[in-house]
From Swiss-Prot:
Its main location: nucleus. Belongs to the SLX4 family. Residues 35-54, 683-695 have a biased composition (Low complexity). InterPro entries: Slx4_ascomycetes, Structure-sp_endonuc_su_Slx4. It comes from Paracoccidioides brasiliensis (strain Pb03). Regulatory subunit of the SLX1-SLX4 structure-specific endonuclease that resolves DNA secondary structures generated during DNA repair and recombination. Has endonuclease activity towards branched DNA substrates, introducing single-strand cuts in duplex DNA close to junctions with ss-DNA. This is Structure-specific endonuclease subunit SLX4. The keyword Magnesium does not apply. The gene is SLX4. Residues 58-72 have a biased composition (Basic and acidic residues). Signal peptide: none annotated.
Amino acid sequence: MTRQLSSDGRMFASSIITVIPDSSPTAAEAIELSSPLSLPSPTSLLDFLSTSTSRGPARSDTDGDKTQGKEVLDTRPILENSFRRENRVVSGTGGKAATGKKLKRRTESPGNACQSEIHIVPGERIILRQTRPDKKAAKTKRTKKEDGLMNRKLYGRVSKANQTVSLQPETKKSAPKGCNDTTQPAENGHINDLDDGLQLEQAIQRRLDWTPTKDTTIPVIDLVGDSPSSCEKSLSGMRSTRTMLSNYEFSGIVGTLGGSRSEGTPDAPTTKRPVELLKVNNLKEISGLSDSRQSSITEDSESATSKPRRVKAKNPPKSKLTTITSYATAKYTVVEKSVDLDPVETLLSDEPGKEKNVAKRTSGARYAKPGRKKSATTEKKNEPPIFKVVPPLEAFKAFDGQELLFGTSSQLANGHSEDQHEQNEGTSHISNSSAFIPLSRSESSSKAPSQTSLGSGFLKLSSSKNLWSAGARDLTGAVLEIDEIDLSEHWMKPSIFESQPKAPLGCKADTQIPPQLGEIDFDNSCQKPLAAIDPPELVTQSETPSEKGDLHKYIVKPTHINSCSQSGSSISVGSPEKPVQDKPIFSGFTTSELAKKVAAYGFKPIKSRDKMIALLEKCWENRNKTSNSVPKLTPGDRLSQVDESTQGQSLGPHLKPNSIPQTATTQVPKVKPDKRDTKSQGVPVPSRRSTSTSKVSRKRTESPSAILVDDDQRSDSTGDSVPPSRPRRPSKSCTPRDRQKTPESFNLPTTPLTIRSGKIPSTGTASETLPSLSTQITAAIKAQPRLRAFNGVKQPTWYEKILMYDPIQLEDLAVWLNTDGFERIGEDREVCPGLVREWCESKGVCCIWRKQRGVRAHCPLVRA
């Protein structure tokens, strides 16, 4: 461009020289201006450019740029001019100016065709751009390219004449997208500073590795203060995000904050978010989004979280119960209330003071006064605890003095502690006995509520807990019908005991033939429960153990009442007579009283009132029917007495009339033993014993008599019983057939005859001086001499077998003791395998039964 000085002293451009980059100097042509105050016309510019470009300026780098396939930054000369013009695109055909449009003029040449373009951009710059199309441009469609993808651009700026024209290269960059705000910065430097502050390059690379969490904050419109711009919101949002993420950093203190629960507003979202973030968001919503307020909130939150951490570091939380001992002793420990209040309990409280504390939970004032809350707990700690875990030695001492209750969990859980203890205590006294001792009315009445509370379950019987009590029930668990008790009334009339005189011994039966030996007819013989004596007369709480042993002595009852027994046999009991009481009117009782009365008799609760009245009337009649008062039995205990009375009747066929001291006038007829008990006890057949000598019989009659009840089951349950004596053998003068037809009678001593298992009645002085059979068995085994070898094989003695832990056959040892062992030591009594088993178990001797013990008897026959 050439400059000329005008008359008024201003400089103007007289010509414009176009400079094409990467071209030879000859390519630059000058455009003469018609007037110093006007720019060249578009037509002249187009004509000049078309002629200059048709000459083919050298562009060696065009093909290279195209082959590289990358965006090339163009450097353009800037032409300055003093006149400011609007953006114009000058067309070469009509010379019309249209704003915002581009016009291209195409000049065709055989080998080198170019396109020239003039574009006036804001800032009074003229852009002269030349493009060369490809060789196959005619065949391909021309596509419009964006500004950033143009090959070459020439920027020209028209400035005043006094300014110098400067050619400066400029690197084009894509303008960054700023904030969508109404006010944009006027200079590009401010935008560059904003871009540098955002650090988009680092953010892009960081985004490839990690995607930040989605911002779920609730926008809050602050109507009080001026709303900040969107740029300020974005900057403050970035700072708040960094603050939130900083809460996840490890603080170096192990422990959880006491107030980790945050009480958010009811309108807060229900999404799962970290508790710390919820707390910070609530503070941000309240205080706003300004930088100064956000910094103060951060300081408050840090100070609030630092205080409870120090408190929790000093007082760590208690460890959970993780051991068996901790679980066992948990119910004895004193529960201490925690220092931190539960937010739910605080919100539900009606006190206004507590509601004020709830509003201050989000700030540090919550932990400002923990001392007042701690004082309440320290006062409780000073009080002595109700239960405390004692050392093991003291625990063992306390365990020794503790009364233990044994039973299944259902029994211990359903029963009351006091009643259960009384029942267990009463049951332990009569556990070794088979007879039933009814409880008093007071005790039965006290236990009635616990019995009725079980509902449909089994009734907790007030009688002894034995198998015969359970056998008195049907398959549904109900007590046997009462009619079975009344079936036996026909043979136990008052006239039998009162009006009939004593009959001479040896009277034969007229109408009924007894069954064979060892059998009992249950169809024709049924026992009626004896009339009950008042329970307080039988059982008292102050009885000594020696007295309790004599409580279960009952009279052997006959199983068949025939003409002989009705005419000649009678039973007299030494207990005093009771006056007959008036029959109470049970219909006037209430239902609860009737239930107590029924429970007092040991029956299951009955729902019907009429059935209870009928049952009580029958029970009262049975008690007061006879003048002789004898104990009343329940159906289960009645079966027990039948069984045990028949078990002990091995005495009957083998006793001689003169073998028992005649100190009483009471006579009892013979009772047939049970068939099943005969098998288990092995009652010897009299015909086999008929070969015994009179000398042995005379010697046996001098020893005191006792009833023996020993079988396999009885020996298992009673380990502390005294060995009984051997049943007596009959004399030669009496044949077995005569004994079957003639009921033997014998005189009883003043005390009732004992039917207890393995016990000898203390009626004579001779039985007290006799040593126990256990010591006699030991003496007999040790007194056995050595045996001679048989066929070169040594025969060990019983003592040597025991020392070598050889299994001892109980039947063989019992036979040896009865034949050879007791004769060496002068013992006249005999033992059964059941008693030998008890001795073996007490001495720790290995003993076994024979394989055929179900066929053979427990008490085998012993030859004299």
